[in-house]
Amino acid sequence: MNSALQLQPVEMNVIQSLDLGALNNLQADKSHEEWLLQRKGKFTASEIHRLMTALSKPNELPVGAITYVIEKVAETLTDGLPESFSSEAMQWGKDNEVEAIEKFEEKTRLFVNNTGENQKFIKYGKHAGCTPDGLGYGFGAETKCPKSSTHVIYKGILNGQDLKKINSDYYWQIQFSMLCAKKSKWFFISYDKRFSKEKHRLHYAVIERNENDIELLKLRLQLAIDKKLELIKNFK
């Protein structure tokens, strides 16, 4: 008598789907860890705004910038993955980011690659880099899926000057991304599928590369790198 457990086809399909789901999650976790390690100790686009305050004295690093440098020093000299923070709002953005890109592609007829889990970290020298939400021919994309009230505000962004006024953090993020990725323009995309009318859900604006601000970024970044290396020498 064969005592082996006999599974029905439906049950086998369920088990296979569970195994595939677990494998996909494992691969996603591994990719995320690799991404964190690539960024470790580097100044990144998402936080580069921390170097871009107190610009009336461009040749000096303000206190907040020095704090950022110290964090990068600690990451460089310690083992393991850098600390990461996630909130409900951030998870919402992550969950809807790919859909936002798809809606953008439908609207503009532009093709965007390196999205979602296929995003790539682009190094800028040894100490910096960026991870675009998407890349296309001659452009990049930064996608936000904010609170509905914030989406209303973002509808007022039509160009780089508007973005700099409404959210300077994102402005500097995009300018630095253009520097890293060698692009001349970047799309700022805001998407909120909770709006009743579909035409209200997607908003985007072209942000042009600003060479004057790029030079400011390069200046502050070099100051930050110099400070980082100076502090690391204390541990030699």
Roles of regions detected by a PLM:
Residues 1-95, 157-164, 236:
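Charged, glycine-rich intrinsically disordered N-terminal tails and low-complexity linkers that flank
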Residues 89-113:
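Acidic-basic catalytic patches of nuclease active cores, encompassing PD-(D/E)XK
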Residues 106-132, 136-225:
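Nucleic-acid nuclease catalytic cores
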Residues 71, 99-102, 172:
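Short, contiguous clusters of charged residues that form electrostatic/catalytic patches at enzyme active sites
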Residues 63, 90-98, 167, 211-214, ...:
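Generic detection of long, well-ordered alpha-helical segments
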Residues 220-236:
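Charged phosphate-binding loop/patch that engages nucleotide di/tri-phosphates or the phosphate backbone
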